[in-house]
Amino acid sequence: ALTHYGPLAVEVTTVLEGIQNKVKPGTEVLFTKGCDLVDANWPESELIRYPLTSEEQSEIDKAVENAKKSDVAVVVLGGSNRTCGENKSRSSLELPGRQLDLLQAVVATGKPVVLVLINGRPISINWADKYVPAILEAWYPGSQGGTAIADTLFGDYNPGGRLTVTFPKTVGQIPFNFPTKPNAQVDGGRNKGLDGNMSRVNGPLYPFGYGLSYTTFEYSDISIQPAIVTQVQPVTVRCKVTNTGKRAGDEVVQLYVRDILSSVTTYEKNLVGFDRIHLNPGETKELTFTIEPRDLQLLNSDNHWVVEPGDFKVMVGASSEDIRLNDRCTVVEYGKEQAATSATSRQQKSVIASSSQESAPLVLDGNLSTAWKANKGEYITFALENNASPN
């Protein structure tokens, strides 16, 4: 839980100790190692399946016996700085060594199982995802990680973390990163089955931004202002989130955008904002995000960062693949946004432009960030003073 990047002479609370400190007096906590982190043939065992040795089978049998005697089994698996770190590329993303054998044997007892992962990289836990009812990703939780994990397992803490990486299902999907470009993670096939042309399983095991909670959340009332902007104007996005469960909890609300039609291929979704909020049961909060012009930029064929006119899809969700709300905004070329507003609402005023905001505290439209197009086509921000003589 500590790795070799920090001081080692610190007091450590293991997961076992955290659970022992949490249970009520008189509760028996059974423990056995179950298996080593890696087996004797590792890393070759990531390519070749070796039979279990008698010693390995004996350790797994002890874990099975303990599980049969217990109300719930907590299986702690993962990796360490031996399997993850600088210059530690692996041939597989599966659980190393005999860890999956141990997990499968404990699950086969029929007792409730909780899997706790302590690891430094995504692991392809496809079998566990299908057959284990509860999985807690702890990463490297630090010296007091055992206490934090026990608090979470016993419900004294409601987890609210979200993945900053993508968990692939297999190494065959790599590179599998977020964001991705259209059709980057599919093979183009439409027909499944033996006679179809689907050659692989698509989609991540767990997508970017994914994470669960002991409560539930509902999203509603998305609004975008203004819906029509120039290439230099920000956009304000508002939405509401309600805790619809019975527990207080944190939700990480994520804002994504997509350029619907562009001159070059762009990402399916770009994360442009997020906010972690705490909500009590039944509580609703309104969130406000700002999409800046730089959030809509692309690198065009001339290697220039530009905001191209057109429609942008705005998405709010609980992960990159759990989108709850959709809307869109439209970017128009500078000057053409007037077609969407009433020309009679504009007043003629004479102004002077200055490159210093401090020299012109009063601005024509009340916005110090108003941008005007320069003669060479670039955008320069000026401060504009009301009622000044033309200069």
Regions found by a protein language model. Name each.
Residues 220-226, 270-276, 366-367, 378-380:
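Short structured motifs
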Residues 335-389:
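Disordered, acidic Ser/Thr/Pro-rich linker "stalks" and the adjacent N-terminal cap
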Residues 1-16, 20-26, 30-34, 38-51, ...:
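Secreted, periplasmic, or luminal enzymes acting at the cell surface/secretory milieu
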Residues 263-299:
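Intrinsically disordered, low-complexity Pro/Gly/Ser/Thr-rich segments with frequent PxxP/GP/PP motifs
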Residues 21, 27-68, 180, 184, ...:
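Extracellular/periplasmic ectodomains of large secreted or surface enzymes and adhesion receptors
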